[in-house]
Every structure is written in C-alpha cells, then in structure tokens.
A protein has these predicted regions:
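Short active-site neighborhood of thiol/selenol oxidoreductases, capturing the structured segment around
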Residues: 46-69, 75
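Bacterial Sec-dependent N-terminal signal peptides
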Residues: 1-23
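Structural microenvironment flanking redox-active thiols in thiol-disulfide oxidoreductases
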Residues: 69-107, 122-125
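N-terminal "domain-start" segment that seeds a small globular fold
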Residues: 19-48
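Thiol-/selenol-based redox modules, centered on thioredoxin-like
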Residues: 54, 131, 137-162
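Short, internal strand/loop/helix patches
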Residues: 105-136
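Solvent-exposed coil/turn segments that connect beta secondary-structure elements
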Residues: 63, 92-94, 120, 140-141
Length: 162
C-alpha cells in the first residue's frame, strides 16, 4: 500500500503538467464549422453560408456589453473599409435581445453582417472567451490569423488581416 501511495504522489504532478492548456482554436487553426440561430429564430447561418475568398471576423459579444456596443459602432462607422470582410456576430443571449441590438444599430442593411445566437454554446469554449467582445480573425483562405479581446480599432484589425 505504501508503494502505491508513493507512486501516486510521484506521478500526480507529472499528470498535472501533461494537461492540455491550449484553446481549441489554436489546435485547429482554420475556421471551424459552426451554426448560429438567426434573429428570426427559425433559420440558421453556418460557415457554409459565408462568401468564399474573403476574410472572416467572428465576434463573440453580448448585446448588453458596452465594449461590444462600441465595437459594433466602430464597425458600422467604418463599413466602407469592412465591405469585403464577413462579420459573424454570435452571442448566447436570447433572440429578442439580438433583434433589438440589430434594430438599434441598423445591422440589416449590411449584407456582410451575420448575427445570431450560439444555441450549442460552441464558440465560448472553443475560443475560451474571457473578455467581450472577442474578435477571431481568419484570412481569405479561412486560416486563423489572431484573436483580439476587448474593443479593437478597425485599422488594427485590417492591419492584421493584410
């Protein structure tokens, strides 16, 4: 019994060090398959619906988050710079909050904005979100570029996507 206890105490720290600390997006550096429930609460938007050959921004947000609102405002004010980028905005909040958010920022008029609810709670664990908004950037070939947490200037995003 003492030998078992001794072996257990010796190998427990080794097993703890062997734990995987990398977020899934770092292990799988291409745009993941996803689906979000759109604000009409009946249709889905998936990664297959994105325009091919253009960069993608995945934005994890909350309609109640001030920084998320500032980021959305920065996007809409700089829409001419962002027209050739697909922007997927995902939240875990209820659809009615998404609907109100879309109306407030008039997001329906932008064809490159896709807003919905992550009903499968895929994105949070995939990116290990700590701060909102989280912006995950992918190039035109759908390869991972970088992640920004917190509101980020549009020019900094565009520089990263060059």
């Amino acid at each position: 019994m003492r030998i078992f206890t001794l072996l257990f105490l010796l190998f427990t720290p080794i097993l703890a060090l062997a734990q995987d600390h990398d977020a899934p997006y770092l292990k799988y550096p291409t745009l993941p398959n996803f689906s979000i429930l759109q604000e009409d609460s009946t249709s889905w938007f998936t990664n297959r619906d994105l325009r091919p050959g253009v960069p993608v921004i995945i934005m994890l947000f909350s309609p109640d988050c001030d920084h998320c609102r500032e980021q959305t405002e920065m996007f809409t004010k700089n829409i001419n710079k962002l027209r050739n980028i697909e922007i997927v905005m995902s939240t875990f909040q209820p659809v009615y909050k998404i609907r109100n958010f879309c109306k407030e920022f008039d997001l329906h008029k932008y064809q490159n904005f896709h807003i919905g609810r992550d009903v499968k709670y895929f994105f949070g664990p995939f990116y290990r979100i700590k701060f909102a908004p989280l912006l995950a950037l992918y190039d035109k070939n759908r390869n991972f570029v970088t992640v920004f947490e917190g509101d980020t200037k549009v020019d900094k995003i565009l520089e990263a996507l060059k």
